[in-house]
Amino acid sequence: FIAEGTSCRFDDPNDPLIEKQLKARTLSGIKSLKSLGVDSYDFHDLPCGRLDQIPQIAINKIMETAIFDFEPEIVFTHSSTDTNMDHRIVNLCTLVAARPTTNKSIKKIYSYEILSSTEWRFDRVFRPNYFLSLDESHLSAKIKAFSFYTSELQEYPHPRSFLGIETLARYRGMQCGTDLAEAYSLIRDFEI
């Protein structure tokens, strides 16, 4: 996690509720990750909604360190078409940190969509070109993981609702001829 995702929702950056909500959001993230079987993660708590005020090199270094330590072959990042500026910055910094040099293991980079963020960029839409078929157990696991984010969970027709998640999975499934799917945009694929 690059940004803390909480402070930008407050008018006063010194509001004492920020710390309380930040702790709750971090706990939500941990519970969500654990429900998916993820046990290795980092929280960097850079200021939410203000990544444009952080030197890009600092964010690049965070990501380069993670890539060096983890040595992934596949990296997933936010979409460059996202309405959220922090997400677009993370996308750019990911591409910088994942440059194809001899000490990097990355073969593929994908961007993903985030409900209530990616689909609202009407002038520059997310264009998926890679689809991953899901079954009902995958969808249930995804919804369960999201259920821990009580600060993000909304009622339908908001996209960040349980029905919103299911609707997107069914729509992406229709696009590729299956019941359920997730959609990604392949940014880079090295077969070397």
Q: What name fits each language-model region?
A:
Residues 1-18:
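ATP-dependent adenylation/pyrophosphate-handling site
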